[in-house]
Regions:
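Short helix-initiation/N-cap motifs at beta->coil->alpha
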Residues: 86-88
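Conserved "HGTGT" condensation-loop signature of ketosynthase/thiolase-family condensing enzymes
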Residues: 1-82, 98-102, 112-208, 215-216, ...
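Short, well-structured beta-strand segments enriched in hydrophobic/aromatic residues
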Residues: 107-111
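Short helix-loop capping/hinge motifs at secondary-structure junctions, enriched
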Residues: 224-228
Length: 341
């Protein structure tokens, strides 16, 4: 076992919270994020003064961790504001685990917040993509539409297969009172297929929600976790992999970096895909869960279009049980909400 795998079971999530999910007029992104932090600490039974590691990323703050620590009035020994998009917070979990295990810090908080829906617009610190900007794509949906179109072509999938992902997500949301679409009723394949086109083959209901929302988790070492108020959730396996940022640089439009990172995360954990009772995936668009299920090893390449028929409440493989980004909440960067669920 290499050195990085030594973080297996050495740290745990001991508190978690979300705040302002849906529409929260009058709140700033920072206020929402700070509220989630306080609630997560309360869930853990830990005082704010004990937080010495802070991790945050948003689309609105170039130095999110510094801004949040200033707002909270704390002076962390370790801060990380790395922003790699919606997966930033999964990367923060790994960095926090290493910082905790090496003794750099004792208590880590990972946080995110956005008021993009109630603010009525989208502000971003993201720079233009040099090989794509001249073509004026509607990002990020154009990128995922390219991946979806290629998948449909290469594996004989249909738009109805994409629609099934949205239908299953809504079915889960109907069971979740916290979900933004909880009271909106079920979806049918025809509902999704007949929704307003966005970028072919994706329509409006193939795309994630636009909501406000904030989330936070608290992590500590396993030896301290047993003293916290909530039941610890131990980190058993984690990994990262990055191939590209621009869709034009993606080596294979139907294969994500989860193919590599998933194998290493499972190896670290000592488990395999068939051991999983539930799966939480980033579903910004309906193509995502299909690709991730394949790349993570839950089925062979090209078989995801069939497996997704079994991911709803009546199926055999519970996926995105909150309703996911398609029907529960999606305030711009969804990764931390996947972790919470």
């Amino acid at each position: 076992m290499n050195e990085i795998n030594n973080i297996r079971g050495k740290t745990a999530v001991v508190g978690l919270a979300e705040a302002g999910c849906g529409v929260t007029p009058g709140w700033t992104a920072m206020e929402l994020m700070a509220t989630a932090v306080h609630d997560a600490l309360d869930d853990a039974g830990i005082n704010l003064s004990q937080v010495d590691g802070l991790f945050a990323a948003t689309a609105f703050h170039s130095m999110a961790a510094m801004s949040l620590s200033e707002y909270l009035g704390i002076r962390p020994k370790f801060a990380d504001g790395s922003n790699i998009g919606g997966s930033s917070f999964l990367a923060h979990v790994i960095t926090a685990a290493i910082a905790l295990e090496t003794g750099l810090i004792n208590t880590a908080v990972i946080a995110y917040g956005s008021n993009q829906r109630s603010a009525g617009g989208f502000k971003t610190i993201s720079e233009p993509m040099p090989y794509e900007s001249d073509y004026n794509p509607r990002m990020p949906v154009s990128a995922y539409a390219l991946a979806a179109q290629r998948y449909l072509h290469e594996y004989g999938a249909k738009k109805e297969d994409l629609a099934q992902v949205a239908v299953s997500a809504r079915d889960w949301a109907l069971l979740n009172p916290r979900a933004y679409m909880h009271d909106r009723g079920p979806l049918t394949i025809n509902d999704v297929m007949s929704a307003r086109p966005i970028v072919d083959p994706l329509g409006k209901l193939d795309c994630c929600l636009v909501t406000d929302g904030a989330a936070a988790i608290v992590m500590t070492r396993s030896d301290k976790a047993k003293d916290c108020k909530s039941t610890p959730i131990y980190l058993l396996g984690a990994a990262m992999e990055h191939h590209h940022r621009m869709i034009s640089e993606m080596p294979d439009l139907t294969r994500t970096s989860a193919y590599e990172s998933g194998q290493r995360a499972f190896e670290m954990s000592g488990y395999k895909p068939s051991d999983m009772d539930t799966i939480q995936l980033y579903d910004a668009f309906t193509i995502n869960p299909i690709l991730f299920l394949e790349d993570l090893g839950f089925c062979k390449k090209g078989e995801g279009k069939d497996l997704i028929k079994n991911i709803g409440p009546s199926g055999t493989l519970p996926v995105n049980t909150s309703g996911g980004g398609l029907s529960c909440v999606h305030p711009g960067m969804y990764g931390l909400f996947v972790t919470l669920e």
